[in-house]
Amino acid sequence: MSVLFGVAGNSDTFTETVSKASADAPAWLHAIGLDAYEYQCGKGVRVGEATARQIGKNAAQAGIRLSLHAPYFISLANPDPETVKKSIGYVTASCRAAQWMGADRVILHSGALMKRTRREALDIAKANLKAILAACAEQGFEDVTLCPETMGKINQLGDLDEVLELCTLDERLIPCIDFGHL
């Protein structure tokens, strides 16, 4: 296994000097010596199928490995059934877009503690993550790996140990270590 280096989203340098179109990012990343690109859906999955497929085609041609960051408003640690339903929808929409572009990993945040102990929040998140995995399998997204990301704030679920524990639930889960959050 080799280490890949890339960016999350489009940098100011890219948008100011190259293009505002994400489909152009893979060629630029290759030209500057990078080999990975995390497509950002933090504010919602707003990429259409045609654009996603073009990003994937361009990434394949440039030798760029793709991943996708799911919306920030996913809340694994919230027990409210309506919030769980929405979180499942956000993750499955992310997986759909990831499949369109040929990305095999979807990065997601665990959410806030919401005045719960870390253990209580983690147990809720584990149950909700199982429901998300079931929905992903039901909708044909077994080939997409979900990557819970480490979080940096004290009131957020997702320190390194918590992320590692979440990832013990299923082989379709691997940790996303954000070194800026450790």
Model feature map: region roles:
Residues 61, 77-175:
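Active-site acidic/histidine proton-transfer and metal-coordination neighborhood
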